[in-house]
């Protein structure tokens, strides 16, 4: 009986380890070719809006908000290694920061405590009404970085265009990103 339990536990553990071999986005492993991965995103309701040499853009809803997804892949093998969620722009710093804090809380529950850098530098300070100018000029950083054994997740605020900022979440699969870098190095 003990042997059966040990064997079953070993099999279960190997399934769990296999299932967690790649970082996921919306429960879709960040793995496979662009066509395979994009087909899964289309099935989840996203629409392709652009195809470029190293990324494919899709539009849809994530966490109840309109966004653009940027699916990054290896130029050599077309293997997907990262997904960027770029939320639609916002003008209101308070709303943007609130969204950032809510998403950071959820990511912290899922991935653990992040490395955080949230600051305005002189001559700017939070609440002075110049948040966009501070971000545009490099006087502000708002980023939470989560590191796991299988990948990296970053949540950050960036300026988008005149007087607008946006919230971005990046999901990078460690294994496929390293594979992509090696493929590029092999080309040199």
Locate the predicted segments by residue.
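Sec-dependent N-terminal signal peptides
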Residues: 4-17
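A cross-family detector of function-defining hotspots
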Residues: 33-79, 84-188
């Amino acid at each position: 009986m003990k042997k059966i339990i040990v064997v079953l536990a070993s099999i279960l553990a190997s399934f769990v380890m296999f299932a967690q071999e790649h970082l996921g986005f919306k429960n879709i492993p960040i793995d496979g070719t662009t066509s395979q991965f994009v087909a899964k995103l289309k099935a989840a309701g996203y629409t392709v809006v652009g195809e470029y040499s190293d990324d494919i853009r899709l539009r849809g809803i994530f966490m109840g908000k309109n966004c653009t997804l940027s699916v990054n892949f290896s130029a050599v093998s077309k293997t997907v290694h990262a997904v960027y969620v770029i939320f639609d722009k916002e003008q209101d710093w308070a709303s943007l920061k609130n969204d950032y804090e809510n998403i950071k809380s959820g990511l912290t529950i899922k991935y653990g405590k992040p490395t955080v850098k949230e600051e305005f530098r002189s001559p700017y300070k939070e609440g002075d009404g110049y948040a966009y100018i501070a971000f545009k000029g490099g006087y502000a950083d708002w980023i939470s970085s989560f590191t796991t054994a299988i990948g990296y997740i970053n949540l950050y605020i960036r300026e988008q265009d005149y007087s607008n900022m946006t919230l971005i979440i990046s999901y990078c699969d460690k294994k496929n990103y390293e594979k992509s870098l090696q493929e590029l190095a092999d080309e040199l």
